[in-house]
Amino acid sequence: MGSRVRVLNATHVRSPETSNPLPNNDDDHAIKLSLLDTMFLPYQPMRRLFFYEGDDLPPFPALLRTLQSSLAATLAVFTPLAGHLAVSSPSEDVVIDCSPSAVSQGVRFVEAEYAGTTDDMRRLASDAEAYAQLVPTLVVTALPVPALAVQVTRPADTDDGGGIGAVVAGVSMCHGVGDGQALWEFIRAWAAAARGGSPALPGFLPPVFDRAVINRHPKAEAVSRTFLRIFAPALPMMNAFPKPDTTLQGRRTYLLSARQIRSLKQRISPQSNGNLADGDGVPPSTVPKPPTTYAAVASLVWTGADDDAYLLFTADCRARLRPPMPAAFLGNCVKLCYARATMGELRDGGVGALARAASAVREAVREQLEDPLGDVDRWLECYRAVPPDRFVQIGSSHRFAAYETDFGWGKPSRVELAAVFVREFVAVVSVVLDRGCMDGFEANFLSQLDGLE
């Protein structure tokens, strides 16, 4: 497929000043990556898409001015996102370069046009390849690489006057700079600045860049060096994970209402299924009351027909470290967790299977996050021990109120995860799978929804 997107203009947004300086121990305007940052260096950038539509959208030039001026104001507070991932000399550490020369380059801001109508843009939900063209490109195969890039795309059937009908804002952020929570904190602040002129609205917590709590761990330096030897043995070149072939993928998005989620939790809970503990081999103490939204929805996804099945997911560690990291920490602070079950526990597809899947997720979180960094020297060993054909990888942004992202012209009609790090991935509840697997997954997934109010 050829490109459906034409670049109209590309510029750089620069912050006039920095209002949130780096920690005192960060010399030379550089933030040394922690072991948790280094772990994500080979990953493709995180990419998010926000679809806005309606007659209330401002003319495209006015919309661009609002986004650019508010981005500049936000970068003054989120300084590392204006910098670059780079190699420091002579230590050969990978750092976020926030020096004046790096930050002064600004964040690349692309204005683009989609070769189709507003209605065409609405129908892109199942087209992974088209989605990839709506977000800016960040190539992570060699350092330095910018931390952030932005693209704003309009359909071709609009002009610069009046309401434009639809627009898509795409954001790409290098995963080595921060995790999903870091990205969403930035996007929330940017939207607040667009609405009110400043990201520092009531309730705003300035981002924290200090990685000392993580870097002080006795195994931190050795593990970080191990990650670097594997992911970047010939700095500044990077062994980036290859992009999955989007032409082989199918994409689906499913909407679960709040009522359906409540009903799902009630179905899973043994207290609402009196015979579950005795009839399905699930002790009453095994499944928490109630399961979290994440565990409940994950149980819908995680059904398999392998001898052993694994669910891989990242879990936030900020509140679980000792001392804890603040919620506003701008960096990576997640751990890859593994839930395990057998074919017999998952394959019946009934309420019992859902309960066992939810229980396994909750138990994995309890065990593996009690001391998040205690087994850090075994993470690679554990990951390599999981058979690649026996796991489902899942991610979630449900805690981040994505549909509250209002830049001043209302909430988005759709928010999508455009980056997929592996060939098959589930983002609650947008699904990317091999095309041959999608129909079977969809039939099973929808059958599990039967009976939800």
Language-model regions: role of each:
Residues 10, 24, 150, 237, ...:
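Generic detector of low-complexity/intrinsically disordered segments
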Residues 1-36:
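Long, contiguous juxta-domain segments that are non-catalytic but functionally important
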Residues 2, 113-116, 121, 125, ...:
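A signal for specific C-terminal beta-sheet/loop modules enriched in small/flexible residues
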Residues 37-39, 147-154, 423-428:
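Short, surface-exposed beta-strand/loop micro-motifs that present aromatic residues
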Residues 15-19, 28, 42-43, 47-80, ...:
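Soluble acyl-CoA-dependent acyltransferase catalytic core bearing the H(X)4D motif
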Residues 390-453:
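Low-complexity, glycine/alanine/valine/leucine- and proline-rich hydrophobic stretches
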